[in-house]
């Protein structure tokens, strides 16, 4: 199929479905009409989209962990523990790395080896291999909505199986689940594959089944300037809306300066709604998700809790609908269920104490919002120009030209010419602009902020600052000051 930002016809969609469902034997279990009937029977409190609408209307921030293991019964036990002991509001199923690369044979081996070893030898739940029946077994064993969280450039079969399995949210997008996760997948291919995932959700919406879609906000999780991640989120929201998605959660990964983070999340919500309405998508319900610190963590558990609670405070004061929870084992590896629950409990306590509180508008917040919105608009306007009005084509060209450029992305289709660094207050700014199409005024603003840091630290603005910033939080502070 040729890539364009146009809703797929029923014929195009169903023709591709036939191929997709043959990628692995469990694809045969998917029957769309039967899936619609099953999904309609799921109570509202277990529907992701509906629970998000409720949270947004009440003005509360809900907590969701990450979690997934190889064996079905152990996965259920883990999720129940995070529900009952941790007090999670939403549940995940983090999908394993083989599934993310569509290597289902190796998943099968991983399941068998895990059974032999008596513990999970995969870093997530192999949803495709367990199929619709397995996914339903998970849903029916818990009392909360389920979402697939993964990192899959081609998530078509996974999307078919999890939605038919009753999971009412799928995370990802053609940019956010390609550029930070894969090396050799073209932007065009991943955009097409995610159009399929969005069209599937659009099909369910047409049948009266509400399903949430969540672009992955943090991208590489390392010093991503808010305007760049917001431009990606807004782009993926617009592409999803064209395929018929009606419930979208745009995401943002904590950078660490409270004013900048609150400004970024509010700009993301406001500009997503502005762009959706400007392009005629008037019936899309937008919520936000704030990801607790995605970079390196301190190894000390008490310090890790400090990072978790600081992030939660920012999420609450920003008015996020949902916060993604980290654990005190983040620096060590995959957490125990106890450590995961501990992260949720710390998060929930902070959320409860801050319920209803918001950061009021200030001169600083207003300035930061104006900068982020202006930067984001520069990127998006250029994308529409490159695509001659077609955002899907514009996205491909934006990566070809470096207009959209994700710092530290492994993809060979990412320019990697833009370089971020913190300013003297810890806000993430642009050190090297690459081909990001900012006005001279915006460029000067970034340069001035970095000069303030250089003066304070008594050193030149340089790549050494970037390196220092990357390791700073793991060493116990936000900004990588010289030793």
Swiss-Prot record:
Cofactor(s) required for function per UniProt: adenosylcob(III)alamin
Sites where the protein binds adenosylcob(III)alamin: 68, 123, 180, 297, 326, 330, 334
UniProt keyword annotations, A-Z: Cobalamin, Cobalt, Isomerase
GO biological process, one term: anaerobic glutamate catabolic process
Residues binding L-glutamate, per UniProt: 66, 100, 149-150, 171, 177, 181
Catalysed reactions, as listed in the record: (2S,3S)-3-methyl-L-aspartate = L-glutamate
Pathway: Amino-acid degradation; L-glutamate degradation via mesaconate pathway; acetate and pyruvate from L-glutamate: step 1/4
EC number, as in UniProt: 5.4.99.1
Known partners and oligomeric status: Heterotetramer composed of 2 epsilon subunits (GlmE) and 2 sigma subunits (GlmS). GlmE exists as a homodimer and GlmS as a monomer.
Protein task: Catalyzes the carbon skeleton rearrangement of L-glutamate to L-threo-3-methylaspartate ((2S,3S)-3-methylaspartate).
Family of this protein: Belongs to the methylaspartate mutase GlmE subunit family.
Name of the protein described by the UniProt record: Glutamate mutase epsilon subunit
The encoding gene: glmE
